[in-house]
């Protein structure tokens, strides 16, 4: 894999300065035109970005030719196959070679690109990522990390896992804490992230056995891994300023994520109905327009689009399948930021640290038992 040294990051053909992002142009609900539009939007804001884009060559050449910001900054890899949202991960593992998703990950595996971005099928993308990139040594279960709007200065919190695996034992939760803290530090500049473990209450006697075990394990690595452990947190803390990283299993995290998305949609619909009921309410909406736009920007799901697959030998960012150009651009921006920070090598170091720490703890317990 590429070194964390920015001077040795993969470069696009013909360019000595750009960080390369591998992009799957197919698989999203809106088609390759939206993905290319998102690439152009991101390229206009980030002069140092270059792309290897995967999909039908003739179609991509036509779409890219219309975007001046992409001139000379793309290398197209022809891939006729497409992984659809209906494809099962098991089928993709057997027959996925030749698809744009497979080709996208292959560019990262071969060291041609630093990170991959795809709007495609989440289950298939995770399965192919584990097959082609492999798990980091010491990682039992990779995790998907998402961003949650919050009261923190950065505007959001990191939560993982949100659906990679419905199970997680104490060691998995410790690994998630280390990976989540590394992600928050390298992706968003938080020098010492605050990590919390999601539970049904903050009292130490509450929760399943694996949560209680993780509650004991996580503080043992916090100092060396440069994060603060705040203990158990509840659902109400997800958008709070008490914590920066929320650790949970994939089942709980996915339910929380989908509940949050549904609630945000409901609030938006109710506000729209309330401000449209009468002439006076429409006038009130006009007076509050500035504040409403600031609120909309703060909680706009497009702005925080991009779930990061953590625990693999490569950085993979999963964009929402229904993302528009702005959402795709946000996912690419996130991948670019992580690539620039040398995130992958730092993450590998943190995971290795967790394995060593767990070994020391287990060794101490065995000595005490004997």
UniProtKB/Swiss-Prot annotation:
Record keywords: Cytoplasm, Lipid biosynthesis, Lipid metabolism, Phospholipid biosynthesis, Phospholipid metabolism, Transferase
Broad enzyme group: transferase
Catalytic activity reported: a fatty acyl-[ACP] + phosphate = an acyl phosphate + holo-[ACP]
Transferase as UniProt keyword: yes
Predominant location: cytoplasm
Residues spanning the signal sequence: none
Keyword check for Nucleotidyltransferase: no
NCBIfam families: plsX
Assigned protein family: Belongs to the PlsX family.
Subunit structure: Homodimer. Probably interacts with PlsY.
Name this protein carries in UniProt: Phosphate acyltransferase
Organism: Paracoccus denitrificans (strain Pd 1222)
């Amino acid at each position: 894999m590429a070194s964390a040294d920015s001077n040795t990051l993969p470069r696009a053909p013909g360019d000595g300065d750009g960080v390369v992002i591998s992009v799957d142009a197919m698989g999203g609900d809106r088609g390759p035109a939206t993905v290319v539009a998102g690439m152009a939007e991101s390229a206009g804001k980030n002069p140092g970005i270059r792309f290897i884009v995967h999909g039908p060559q003739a179609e991509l050449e036509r779409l890219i030719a219309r975007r001046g910001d992409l001139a000379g900054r793309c290398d197209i890899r022809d891939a006729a196959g497409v992984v659809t949202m209906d494809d099962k991960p098991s089928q993709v593992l057997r027959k996925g070679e030749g698809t744009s998703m497979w080709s996208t990950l292959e560019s990262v595996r071969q060291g041609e690109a630093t990170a991959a971005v795809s709007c495609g099928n989440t289950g298939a993308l995770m399965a192919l990522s584990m097959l082609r990139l492999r798990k980091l040594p010491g990682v039992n279960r990779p995790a998907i990390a998402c961003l949650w709007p919050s009261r923190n200065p950065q505007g959001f919190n990191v939560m993982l896992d949100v659906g990679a695996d419905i199970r997680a034992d104490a060691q998995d939760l410790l690994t998630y804490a280390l990976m989540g803290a590394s992600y928050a530090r390298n992706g968003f500049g938080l020098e010492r992230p605050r990590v919390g473990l999601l539970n049904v209450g903050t009292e130490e006697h509450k929760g399943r056995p694996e949560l209680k075990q993780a509650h004991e394990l996580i503080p043992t690595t916090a100092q060396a891994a440069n994060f603060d452990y705040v203990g158990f947190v509840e659902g109400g803390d997800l958008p709070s300023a008490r914590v920066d990283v929320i650790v949970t299993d994939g089942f709980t995290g996915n339910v929380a994520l989908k509940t949050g998305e549904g609630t945000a949609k409901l609030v938006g619909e109710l506000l729209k109905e309330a401000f449209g009921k009468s002439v006076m309410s429409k006038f009130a909406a006009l007076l509050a327009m500035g504040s409403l736009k600031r609120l909309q920007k703060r909680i706009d799901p497009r702005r925080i689009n991009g779930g990061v697959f953590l625990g693999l030998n490569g950085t993979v960012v999963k964009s929402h399948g229904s993302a528009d150009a702005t959402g795709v651009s946000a996912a690419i921006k996130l991948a670019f930021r992580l690539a620039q920070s040398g995130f992958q090598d730092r993450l590998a170091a943190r995971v290795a640290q967790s394995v060593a720490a767990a070994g020391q703890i287990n060794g101490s317990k065995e000595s005490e038992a004997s």
